[in-house]
A protein has these predicted regions:
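Phosphate-binding/switch loop-helix module in NTP-utilizing enzymes
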Residues: 123-193
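A short alpha->loop->secondary-structure connector
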Residues: 88-90, 110-117, 165-172, 211-219
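Catalytic P-loop NTPase motifs of RecA-like helicase/translocase cores
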Residues: 102, 157-158, 204-205
């Protein structure tokens, strides 16, 4: 790609403009309670979760989070990325893997070091939630910023009765989820522990013509006790073509998934964010941010402020990475997202 200015000048030019726009931003994200927030690896999803409480958004500590959706929609990717970000902050990670399929090489792609986590393969619902109640920090670990527990996925958990083939209808599992969550959720809040679980969806045969066509296994307790529920939906498969020895070949290199804030007591619900997940890379935040700016600003080229990055998404990504503009791009997205959200803030006189 032909560049008309040197990378250093381009970077400094955009950064100066970004500083001015930040100073002019009269309504940055407000927050209350905890100031400990974990990123999902996606700027847009972080903002959708709590952009009105924290400037950069993210998942606050001390809550239960459920990530659910159909198979292949990116649930495990999101789970591993959050766990990897916890490790980067120096936090402790306990990873329950009832499906027994965590790929260690795959997890390293997200910064998650398998050797440094407490890894278990539980069989029952009780095993998972009792570990939360019994996980008391050691005296020499008081400087650990956050303790986190992950479970992938809740749908794979059983009960002692079911294992002994005494639960023919499968009703005991829903009861155990309700009992265990009732005992565990207060401890999660008191100890400021973050618990993130993935779950599958099943067809709801009793939905009728107007009811919800799907449901999550394990009864209603998980959704009831979760402070944040994220639903992942596969939007499309990302394809690329390459020419090898004069022949054109096409491969699927990743997926685009939509994450809906299905329930939230963290901030406003019913926001959504698009995630681009590449098989050999993980969550492509640069791609998502560039497409967001191009869509909301309705420009013909990819750009950051006054800086044009070209019409090709691959060229634009390369320019951002070459000039080290990742943080500048992120700040631009946050500023514009806040400007849009501010227009939907109720300006009426407070009732109380």
């Amino acid at each position: 790609m032909q560049r008309t200015k040197s990378p250093v000048k381009l970077s400094s030019q955009v950064k100066k403009k970004q500083r001015r726009s930040e100073l002019q931003n009269s309504s940055p994200g407000q927050y209350d309670g905890t100031d400990l927030v974990i990123s999902t690896g996606s700027t847009l999803l972080d903002l959708a979760i709590s952009g009105g409480r924290f400037r950069e958004g993210g998942i606050p500590a001390g809550i239960l989070v459920e990530i659910f959706g159909p198979s292949g929609s990116g649930k495990t990717v999101l789970l591993c990325q959050i766990a990897g970000n916890v490790q980067k902050l120096g936090g402790r990670v306990m990873f329950h893997d009832p499906e027994a399929r965590l790929n260690r090489q795959f997890s390293r792609m997200f910064g998650l070091v398998p050797e440094d986590i407490e890894y278990t393969i539980p069989d029952t619902v009780t095993e998972v939630f009792s570990s939360v109640r019994n996980w008391i920090p050691d005296k020499d670990e008081q400087d650990v910023p956050i303790y986190t527990i992950f479970a992938d996925s809740l749908a794979a958990l059983s009960t002692e009765m079911e294992i002994g083939e005494g639960d023919k209808m499968g009703m005991r599992r829903a009861k155990e989820f309700s009992e265990e969550l009732r005992k565990t959720c207060r401890i999660i809040t008191q100890r400021n522990v973050l618990m993130v679980c993935s779950n599958q969806i099943r067809q709801n045969l009793n939905a009728g013509p107007y009811g919800q066509k799907w449901k999550t296994p394990g009864g209603e307790a998980i959704g009831f006790y979760s402070s944040l529920r994220l639903r992942c939906s596969l939007v499309q498969k990302l394809k690329e073509s390459r020419v090898v020895r004069g022949q054109k070949h096409e491969r699927i290199i990743g997926i685009k998934t939509k994450v809906d804030i299905f329930k939230s007591s963290v901030w406003k619900p019913y926001r959504e964010a698009d995630l681009y997940i590449l098989f050999d890379y993980g969550i492509d935040d640069i791609r998502a941010n560039l497409r967001f700016l191009k869509t909301v600003l309705k420009t013909s080229v990819y750009r950051i402020g006054d800086l044009s990055l070209g019409k090709s998404i691959d060229e634009a990504i390369q320019a951002v990475e070459t000039d080290h503009l990742e943080q500048v791009l992120k700040d631009e997205v946050i500023t514009i997202w806040n400007e849009i959200e501010e227009k939907f803030t109720d300006q009426r006189k407070p009732r109380i």
